[in-house]
Amino acid sequence: MSSPSQPLQKIAPSVKLGEGVRIFDFTNLYGCEIGDDVKIGAFVEIQKGVKVGKGCKISSHSFICEGVTLEEGVFIGHNVTFINDRFPRATNADGKLQTEADWKCIPTLVKRGASIGSGATLLCGITVGENAIVGAGSVVTKDVPPDTIVAGNPARVKKSLPVRA
């Protein structure tokens, strides 16, 4: 339980916040850039190097790791997880604990207007196309074409959407 003098958010000094950003309690932001008019729900973590474009909505309990870029107007549902390491290991082949020097961040891009459904997991090294929709609970392992709906584990194209003007 926090006292009135304790912050309910952890926003590191290295965070760049745009105008009109709304951040709910129990968030953890560090080393990221947040564009104008973004809404960040409770219990969200956004790591260093993440770029969140103008007008995005990130729902509660989501994890956005280093290497992720969200373009303008992206919707992230509740409990969405991004992965940035294709082969995560605790130790190297010699048995020594891995350090940051042993790790390679693989970027992920979510393009303008895309929507990611609640409970989805997005593996690294993919692009979610403009206005694409990822169904709730999906596991995205490869690129999602623009203007499509994908769903499932692994996520597959279910439907093409009319192209927006």
At which residue positions do the language-model features occur?
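Flexible, glycine/small-residue-enriched loop-and-beta-strand segment within the central core
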Residues: 2-13, 25-126, 153-154, 159-162
